[in-house]
């Protein structure tokens, strides 16, 4: 038997057969079927969507942001690859109603054509592929908290931008350093309603422990925790293989922010029929850009890195890893410090 009795996970009554069906179903209904008005039912009026680029509060603001994205990418498709989820304790729940609450981590791959002007500049006609990872807290068929990481590095590279150059251009188009939209930082957070951390499943705890050890400088854990042939899907829509690539990625991030505080926020592990054991971890780095690494010359800029990682496990350890952070939001924070 799987670790989830799917008959228990019926958010919003019996329309949805389980939590993955709800998350994938409303995503298609909103974005592809153009039922943007349904956001008023599926998203709470005071809920917050936090992304590395900003924080958006309230379903009306989410509708506006959704319209802007669809106007720029009218043929956008959102293909759900996985939804990792767990029930939440009554004491952790916010949102409406008195039903069972859920935390979910949705991994999807998007396809789109940059065919209209918008946030990404004049239309390039380029075909895009990129991932999103999103953690949502829901109850009674309504999402009341969300943390979303979009692979902006992949989007801007495929359009023809370097992430740093795009961040500089965006600051200018938004009115300069004083007037531009400020990237998300914990000090800007508000309307936090979900207070839990996920579940205690061993797979999730192992994944979180590996991340903690790497961020503490114990890069040697990669040899024991990762499959030698690990498949990696990384920011910039980069695909890599092997332990050396995992070491290069995680060391390049940590060495850029060697003194930053690393924190685990959500951890879930899950085992289901037809799936490998898998996990989802939402994490962050907060501190100074004080080292040489993936983000160039140290600047001393205060930076918050919002990250989400999914992992799948096999007989030889972590065999597939999907990790996202937003390179453009990191560069924007650095450039706001350095000019």
Regions found by a protein language model. Name each.
Residues 1-339:
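C-terminal and inter-domain tail/linker signature
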